[in-house]
Amino acid sequence: MWGAFLLYVSMKMGGTAGQSLEQPSEVTAVEGAIVQINCTYQTSGFYGLSWYQQHDGGAPTFLSYNALDGLEETGRFSSFLSRSDSYGYLLLQELQMKDSASYFCAVR
């Protein structure tokens, strides 16, 4: 059965003042779809971009980390980073109901 569900997107910063992140607040999708969650950031000291997934009532689960430009693929999830554009994204493929969660990008 195909149904629409929400992916909630949040943001988290590292410990340095003067940083900012931008992400959409929610994404609606259907099972089997491909969803791209974008993250732009501004920071004076950048070491990498991490992505986390958190289900209601649970602890955040680490998904990926990019320190260098390019695409990192891990199963159905891929993450991309462009340091020169201060931009990254998380790509979720073959979306499943269990993917309904909050997603966080975090700058280090």
UniProtKB/Swiss-Prot annotation:
Keywords in alphabetical order: Adaptive immunity, Cell membrane, Disulfide bond, Glycoprotein, Immunity, Immunoglobulin domain, Membrane, Receptor, Signal, T cell receptor
Disulfide bonds: C39-C105
Domain (Ig-like): residue spans on this chain: 19-108
UniProt-annotated location(s): Cell membrane
Main location: membrane
SUPFAM superfamilies the record matches: Immunoglobulin
Glycosylation sites: N38
Signal peptide (from-to): 1-18
A Pfam family: V-set
One GO cellular component term: T cell receptor complex
Gene Ontology biological-process entries: adaptive immune response; response to bacterium
The keyword Cell membrane appears for this protein: yes
Subunit structure: Alpha-beta TR is a heterodimer composed of an alpha and beta chain; disulfide-linked. The alpha-beta TR is associated with the transmembrane signaling CD3 coreceptor proteins to form the TR-CD3 (TcR or TCR). The assembly of alpha-beta TR heterodimers with CD3 occurs in the endoplasmic reticulum where a single alpha-beta TR heterodimer associates with one CD3D-CD3E heterodimer, one CD3G-CD3E heterodimer and one CD247 homodimer forming a stable octameric structure. CD3D-CD3E and CD3G-CD3E heterodimers preferentially associate with TR alpha and TR beta chains, respectively.
Described function: V region of the variable domain of T cell receptor (TR) alpha chain that participates in the antigen recognition. Alpha-beta T cell receptors are antigen specific receptors which are essential to the immune response and are present on the cell surface of T lymphocytes. Recognize peptide-major histocompatibility (MH) (pMH) complexes that are displayed by antigen presenting cells (APC), a prerequisite for efficient T cell adaptive immunity against pathogens.
Name of this chain's protein: T cell receptor alpha variable 1-1
Organism the protein comes from: Homo sapiens
Lineage of the species this protein comes from: Eukaryota, Metazoa, Chordata, Craniata, Vertebrata
